[in-house]
Amino acid sequence: MDVKRVKQILSSSSQIDVTYQGVPVWIESCDEGRGIAQVHDITAPHETVEVDITALEEK
């Protein structure tokens, strides 16, 4: 995935399915300068991690 698409997903009112290493995640925010996004596993909303945006996949 790229930064532009992450920003589109963040501003969308629709639920868009995204995975990180095969795990469904919710994107919390993105840091365009660093190329990372803060995400959490949809089953564990209190466990936010930073991941490389290019590792995110839209399903």
Curated annotation (Swiss-Prot):
Keywords from the UniProt entry: Sporulation
Superkingdom of origin organism: Bacteria
GO cellular component: endospore-forming forespore
Subcellular location per the Swiss-Prot or TrEMBL entry: Spore core
Induction or repression: Expressed only in the forespore compartment of sporulating cells.
Gene Ontology terms describing biological process: asexual sporulation; sporulation resulting in formation of a cellular spore
One family name in Pfam for this protein: SspH
Entries under NCBIfam families matching the protein: PRK01625.1, SASP_H
Family the entry assigns: Belongs to the SspH family.
UniProt xrefs under HAMAP family: SspH
Official protein name in the record: Small, acid-soluble spore protein H 1
Organism listed in the record: Bacillus cytotoxicus (strain DSM 22905 / CIP 110041 / 391-98 / NVH 391-98)
Lineage: Bacteria, Bacillati, Bacillota, Bacilli, Bacillales
Gene: sspH1
